């Protein structure tokens, strides 16, 4: 559009307003001018860049401060690597009287330096820093490059079309893969290729017109002809609309990702209307283009940060291991400075807990009681006690986020080793050799709840009070986990396969913490058994304690029906119906009178809205207040005879005295089923095969 009308005051209002240049200093061609639209855009980009840099710096400071607060003397001040930190005492000594240095606590054991945390190496941090620098360069270019030079349109096209990368690359961080470097790299390459194509075609189109800028005319920032601009904005609008529609039907983007899509859709919609009006030679076209460009530039930084996360979410590269770093102080205070050490490549051990470490040659192994992709579970005798040893092949822990494979193993060990409750599976020790990692737990003779419901459900039918005992035991264990401080520990895979029973079937314990996490801000991964997943988890929303409550409701339903929640449906179909059609498995008819209150509790637990579900504190109070008065329950015969245990060990040349397990009152349970996180975020079942 010809802008010469500005000088003779024959433009329409919008054209005049957004093409007008206000002289700030000087005269003639050397005067410093302020263009209403372009310079406002430049200031907007600079504002967005400064905002992002400020929030990044604030996040880094927050990380430094929180690290020093956790590891310093409680005063929040930073300390040098040689300073002595206080752990559960004021004199900097642990309970064993061993001084612990900050260097030992963080750098040596976890490879994380307080001065150079992993946040700096995370893809998300690099992306945000890249966008802020790009916006700053674009703003300074528009503000200070002389608009009457031939370099001005070329540089503006090159930098301006870079929004193809900055606008779309962010979407890779919004679909639940966290710091997935492969996905980020792939998306960056795709966006860069598209950027090069559009940038080259735009430059060719501009220079083919042989149009030279006169005075400040190039500062209108309209180097594309109206038809090209309309085509690009309409195409972008259609693509973003399709993607948004796909996220509504199948939520592969986090809810915050839709905010960014709506922002891009709004900008392209207004810009396309402006381009269309310019084609029709309507003055209002410049109003649409100018308003869209200015709002876009000023809101870009704040909205990008709001979409991707807040200060705490910037720690997402370390977020999965924050419980380990927090609880590491407790390990060291209990077992001394040298109790945990991480070895280099090729070393014989990846983790050593001095009080928990057990060598494989200390076991007398019996039969395999569970197996799967990640390894196997074997019954064993250790120091006269029957235990379960989960033997894990080290290469089964490789993951896609670039972290060391030992971290996944370390995570479960860390969670297990700090839990102490009668209704949570007891951790006894850890083994680590060149190619094998092992976790030692108490042996549970009753097997899994899943196997009981499959093979011996008649025991529950004959003794209805058993269902109450199991529900109360599980609720106590889950209340203990959810009441963990400072943040609740979410199980995320609560199912009948992960509830283990004693030989009398009167005590149930929560097991398998391979997928557990301390609650954070971005827990959106879809994990666990599909049949037990809460609707909000299936569609990709935040994982909260109420998701475990939903799983508990289905678990109790399984106890009183003896069936799996999906019944004849495929697990994926069951999860889809529960999420989108509010389907729940039917309650048994008629229901045992002793189970009527359990039925009411089930319906409370599996409500669609997480806010309407009770907490485990309420659940436990409800169960204990409504447990029916019944005749004394007579436990069934032991599931596994002592002689069979001894014979299994004899077959492995490990002779045991018959009846030796009679004296093992401390450890009489079996670790029968396991689910560990496999590559890509799925889970692999360990099927109970012990007779």
Curated annotation (Swiss-Prot):
Protein's UniProt keywords contain Nucleotidyltransferase: no
Keyword terms, alphabetized: ATP-binding, Kinase, Membrane, Nucleotide-binding, Transferase, Transmembrane, Transmembrane helix, Tyrosine-protein kinase
Chain ranges of the Protein kinase domain: 363-634
Cell compartments where the protein resides: Membrane
Biological process, per Gene Ontology: signal transduction
GO cellular component: cytoplasm; membrane
Chief place where the protein resides: membrane
Chain sites annotated for binding ATP: 369-377, 390
Positions of transmembrane segments: 34-54, 127-144, 154-176, 187-207, 228-248, 259-279, 285-305
Name of the protein described by the UniProt record: Seven transmembrane domain-containing tyrosine-protein kinase 1
Source organism (scientific name): Dictyostelium discoideum (Social amoeba)
Lineage summary: Eukaryota, Amoebozoa, Evosea, Eumycetozoa, Dictyostelia
Gene for this chain: 7tmk1
């Amino acid at each position: 559009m010809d802008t010469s009308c500005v000088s003779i005051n024959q433009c329409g209002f919008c054209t005049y307003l957004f093409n007008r240049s206000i002289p700030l200093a000087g005269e003639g061609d050397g005067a410093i001018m302020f263009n209403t639209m372009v310079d406002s855009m430049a200031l907007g980009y600079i504002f967005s860049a400064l905002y992002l840099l400020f929030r990044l710096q604030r996040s880094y400071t927050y990380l430094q401060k929180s690290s020093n607060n956790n590891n310093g003397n409680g005063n929040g001040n930073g300390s040098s690597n040689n300073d002595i930190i206080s752990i559960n005492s004021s004199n900097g000594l642990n309970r064993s009287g061993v001084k612990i240095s900050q260097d030992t606590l963080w750098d040596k054991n976890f490879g994380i330096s307080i001065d150079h945390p992993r946040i700096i190496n995370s893809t998300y941090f690099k992306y945000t820093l890249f966008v802020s620098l790009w916006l700053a360069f674009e703003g300074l270019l528009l503000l200070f490059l002389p608009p009457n030079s031939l370099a001005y349109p070329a540089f503006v096209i090159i930098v301006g079309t870079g929004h193809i990368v900055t606008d779309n690359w962010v979407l890779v961080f919004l679909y639940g893969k966290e710091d997935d470097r492969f996905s980020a790299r792939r998306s960056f390459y795709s966006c860069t290729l598209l950027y090069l194509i559009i940038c080259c075609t735009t430059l060719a189109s501009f220079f083919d017109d042989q149009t030279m800028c006169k005075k400040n005319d190039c500062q209108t920032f309209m180097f594309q002809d109206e038809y090209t601009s309309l085509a690009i904005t309409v195409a972008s609008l259609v693509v973003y609309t399709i993607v948004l529609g796909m996220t509504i039907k199948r939520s592969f983007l986090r809810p915050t990702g839709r905010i960014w899509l709506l922002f891009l859709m709004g900008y392209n919609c207004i810009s396309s209307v402006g381009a269309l009006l310019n084609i029709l030679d309507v003055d209002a076209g410049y109003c649409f283009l100018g308003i869209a460009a200015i709002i876009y530039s000023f809101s870009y930084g704040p909205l990008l940060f709001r979409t991707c996360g807040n200060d705490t979410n910037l720690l997402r590269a370390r977020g999965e291991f924050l419980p380990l770093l927090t609880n590491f102080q407790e390990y060291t205070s209990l077992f001394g400075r040298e109790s945990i050490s991480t070895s280099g490549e090729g070393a014989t051990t990846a983790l050593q807990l001095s009080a928990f470490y057990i060598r494989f040659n200390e076991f007398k192994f019996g039969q395999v009681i569970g197996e799967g992709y990640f390894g196997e579970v074997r019954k064993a005798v250790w120091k006269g006690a029957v235990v379960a040893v989960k033997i894990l092949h080290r290469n089964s822990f490789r993951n896609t986020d670039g972290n060391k494979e030992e971290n996944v193993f370390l995570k479960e060990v860390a969670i297990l080793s700090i839990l102490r409750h009668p209704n949570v599976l007891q951790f006894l020790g850890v083994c680590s050799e060149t190619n094998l990692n092992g976790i030692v737990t108490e042996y549970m003779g009753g097997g899994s709840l899943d196997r009981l419901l499959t093979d011996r459900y008649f025991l529950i039918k004959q003794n209805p009070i058993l269902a109450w005992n199991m529900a109360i035991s599980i609720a106590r264990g889950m209340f203990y986990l959810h009441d963990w401080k400072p943040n609740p520990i979410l199980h995320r895979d609560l199912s009948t396969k992960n509830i283990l029973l004693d030989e009398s079937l009167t005590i149930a314990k929560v097991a398998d913490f391979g997928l557990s996490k301390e609650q954070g801000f971005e827990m959106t991964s879809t994990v666990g058994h599909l049949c037990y997943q809460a609707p909000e988890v299936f569609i990709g929303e935040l994982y909260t304690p109420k998701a475990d409550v939903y799983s508990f409701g289905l678990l109790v339903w399984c106890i009183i029906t003896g069936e799996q929640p999906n019944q004849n449906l495929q697990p994926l179909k069951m999860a889809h119906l529960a999420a989108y059609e509010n389907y729940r498995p039917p309650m048994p008819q008629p229901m045992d009178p002793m189970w009527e209150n359990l039925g009411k509790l089930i319906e409370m637990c599996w409500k669609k809205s997480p806010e309407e579900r009770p907490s485990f504190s309420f659940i436990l109070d409800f169960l204990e207040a409504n447990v029916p008065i019944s005749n004394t329950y007579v436990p069934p015969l032991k599931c596994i005879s002592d002689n069979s245990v001894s014979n299994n060990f004899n077959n492995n040349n490990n002779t045991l005295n018959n009846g030796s397990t009679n004296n093992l009152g401390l450890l009489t349970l079996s670790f029968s089923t396991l689910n560990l996180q496999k590559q890509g975020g799925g889970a692999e079942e360990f099927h109970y095969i012990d007779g």
